[in-house]
Amino acid sequence: MFSEIQTIPDAAAEIKGSPEFPKIRGMVYFFGVHNGTIVAADIRNLPDGNAFHGFHIHEGTCQGTKAEPFAQADGHYNPTNAMHPQHAGDMPSLLANDGNAFLIFYTDRFHPEDVIGRAVIIHAHSDDMTTQPSGNSGAMIACGEIREMKTE
């Protein structure tokens, strides 16, 4: 599977922090493979240094207001109406070390084309994987809209 991530990703999201956390930056890449997707995330300047942060694909976009920066992100991407943590958009929490996080995993819950136009959200706290409907992971502190990567 590592050969797939040495190619141009099918989709990507540029992550930017909320006004409260403007230094958060990163990229999330989506590579279509076999019957699913490899997701690779590289995030910098997360708060709290060494902590877990909820990491989800949401139905909507990163649009919002100054008071609610990502108000239009809506709920977790959940095309099958599953219970949390079985939403298609439920991804493993990010573990920050010195404010930096790197994560790579495979999922068969979606293909890259299914999530184009949706939002990747990073939350202030870890997803407890229990609380309904979304894991009690706190405020949305960073967001990136998933865009198709064009190949020539």
Features from the language model and the residues they span:
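N-terminal leader/targeting pre-sequences
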Residues: 1-152
